[in-house]
Amino acid sequence: TPSAGDSEAPQAGTSATAAKDCFNWGYDPLHFNAPEGSYASDAADGANRIVELRQMVMALHNTGLRVGMDVVYNHTSASGQHAQSVLDRIVPGYYHRLNANGMVERSTCCDNTATENLMMGKLMVDSVELWAKQYHIDSFRFDLMAHQPRAVMETLQRRVNKVTGRHVNLIGEGWNFGEVANGARFVQASQLSLNG
């Protein structure tokens, strides 16, 4: 019988892992759908990353814990023809938000993505659907969610609820700043527009 997630044994395990788990927290996104290698016994083996992450989530669920995932879709680690740029190598200048001079916006301190563009918004929605459906992630915390259009986040919420058959909690930073502040480019998924 699994114990409650807030009971002593699961909490001790969570605390022990948190104390030794020190990595970059994923704020330099490269491949949105690739499981983090540091959680696998062999990070170089892509299939192993997938299998072991699924096993980890299942084990946590079996102890009564739910799994939340921190996601960063507001920027990537690089753009243009940089070695760590992925999206610009597919369609240059489309997946990143550009300023009037054609330069990539960097208000997030990295290369901002343009989820207001149809296919970048779709990439984000499809990615969260994958994590919720295939990995059984229970909730998602969005870094700088106000850099996403409210309409895209609402589409995302409906989609993940539908494919999982349950309500998936979405939590986000609704800060109003940068080139998207005050609805400059779209109605933001911000604290102001979400009445929170």
Which residues does each predicted region cover?
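Secondary-structure transition/capping motifs at alpha-helix termini
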Residues: 60-67, 134, 160-167
